[in-house]
């Protein structure tokens, strides 16, 4: 198995819980066991890797105190789904030019992404906001869109909800909208469970 550390390092990616920040690539090769050329959009999490290895080695992950669950059945072609919801966390603590802490939590079912910014009363900061000439140049662009992106990067709402089907870059926060109440409530409850 080979995986990337996180999603992209571009704006709205690394140091966030938006889809481009947590959607990581994974490649697996196991000749005669896993079908060659297969692709899956099943929801997996890094915490599922160890239980999977335990399972494939003949152990019983259920007997261990592990957070994840084995995706061996997915690898072996016995199912196409794995998790109904996956969770991500980012604290932005101890990073270069970062805030003392800026805790972010998210939950996704693959269609909807719910983000909870636990320090929404503070400005988000990191090396990009302090040293990157690209971010400084964005602040000079005098358009509504540019201003909204800069503001969204440094000032986060307490709750955010994105429709990943229509808005994969997580640009339009739908939290609190009447038409998305059900999705937001469901993912918020799952996060609290």
Write out the residue ranges for each language-model feature.
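Metal-dependent active-site segment of extracytoplasmic phospho-/sulfohydrolases and closely related
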Residues: 1-10, 57
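C-terminal, low-complexity/hydrophilic appendages and adjacent surface loops
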Residues: 18-19, 93-176, 182
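Short, surface-exposed recognition loops and adjoining beta-strand edges that mediate ligand/DNA contacts
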Residues: 66-74, 85-102
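A generic secondary-structure signal for well-formed alpha-helical elements
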Residues: 31, 56-61, 75-79, 111, ...
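Substrate-binding rim/cap in mid-to-C-terminal beta-strand-loop elements of soluble/periplasmic
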Residues: 11-65, 69-84, 172
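Structural recognition of the beta-strand scaffold that forms the well-ordered cores
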Residues: 1-3, 26-28, 45, 52, ...
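Low-complexity, Gly/Pro
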Residues: 25-27, 178-185, 189, 193
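A structural signal for well-ordered alpha-helical segments within the folded catalytic domains
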Residues: 44-51, 66-69, 109, 156-159, ...
């Amino acid at each position: 198995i080979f995986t990337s550390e996180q999603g992209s390092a571009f704006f709205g990616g690394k140091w966030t819980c938006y889809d481009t920040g947590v959607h990581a690539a994974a490649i697996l090769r196991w000749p005669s066991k896993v079908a060659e050329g297969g692709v899956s959009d099943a929801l997996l999490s890094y915490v599922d890797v160890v239980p999977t290895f335990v399972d494939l080695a003949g152990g019983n992950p259920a007997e261990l105190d592990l957070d994840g669950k084995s995706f061996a059945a997915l690898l072996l072609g016995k199912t196409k789904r794995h998790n109904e919801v996956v969770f991500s966390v980012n604290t932005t603590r101890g990073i270069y030019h970062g805030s003392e802490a800026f805790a972010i939590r998210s939950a996704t079912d693959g269609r909807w992404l719910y983000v909870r910014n636990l320090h929404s009363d503070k400005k988000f900061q990191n090396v990009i906001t302090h040293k990157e000439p690209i971010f400084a140049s964005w602040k000079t662009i005098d358009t509504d869109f540019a201003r909204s992106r800069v503001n969204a990067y440094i000032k986060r709402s307490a709750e955010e909800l994105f429709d990943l089907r229509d808005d994969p870059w997580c640009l339009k926060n739908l939290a609190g909208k009447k038409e998305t109440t059900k999705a937001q409530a469901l993912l918020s409850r799952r996060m609290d469970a």
